[in-house]
């Protein structure tokens, strides 16, 4: 397997919703995951967060079910490791308290830290300077899609 990258929903949703900013970079990353050039890891919350994002923009219900099924299949086939929230919970609580992040953002960052993977995100909260500095102190990088190209 290739480089270890942790993915959040702000990246993965671009695999399914066309016309998004940085769509080409997201699709390149998806191809890297499917081609085993990237060892992808995420929180199991990715499923819910991706569904929520698609519901929010009015994506058709049947298509949302397909997206969910596709993501479940990618994890069951080993293309993406979905880490249980409980495995990252203690670190996520520490992060949330230290950085005043949303719970889901804290879980994504904690997952990246415990797996020693670079976190790829388009989430502005996770790209804040203090969050990036915290991640560096924890031994990982936080990258935008533009910075994470294979």
Model-derived features with residue positions:
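Acidic, PIN/NYN-like endoribonuclease modules and their adjacent C-terminal/linker elements
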Residues: 2-4, 78-81, 109, 113-150
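Acidic catalytic patch
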Residues: 44-46, 72-98
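Alpha-helix capping/helix-boundary segments
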Residues: 11-12, 46-47, 88, 107-108, ...
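Helix-adjacent hinge/juxtasegments
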Residues: 54-83
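Short, well-structured N-terminal submotif of metal-dependent ribonuclease cores
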Residues: 1-42, 56-66
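A short acidic, often aromatic-flanked loop/helix-cap motif at beta-alpha or helix-coil junctions
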Residues: 48-49, 88-90, 145-150
């Amino acid at each position: 397997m290739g480089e270890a990258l942790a993915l959040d929903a702000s990246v993965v949703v671009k695999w399914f919703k066309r016309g998004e900013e940085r769509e080409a970079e997201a699709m390149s990353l998806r191809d890297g995951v499917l081609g085993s050039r990237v060892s992808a890891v995420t929180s199991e919350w990715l499923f819910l967060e991706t569904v929520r994002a698609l519901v929010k923009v009015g994506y058709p219900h049947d298509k949302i079910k397909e997206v969910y099924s596709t993501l479940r299949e990618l994890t069951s086939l080993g293309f993406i490791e979905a880490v249980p929230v409980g495995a990252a919970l203690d670190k996520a609580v520490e992060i949330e308290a230290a950085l005043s992040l949303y719970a889901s953002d804290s879980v994504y960052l904690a997952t990246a830290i415990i797996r020693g993977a670079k976190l790829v995100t388009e989430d502005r909260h996770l790209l804040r300077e203090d969050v990036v500095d915290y991640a560096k102190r924890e031994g990982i990088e936080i990258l935008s899609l533009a910075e994470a190209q294979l």
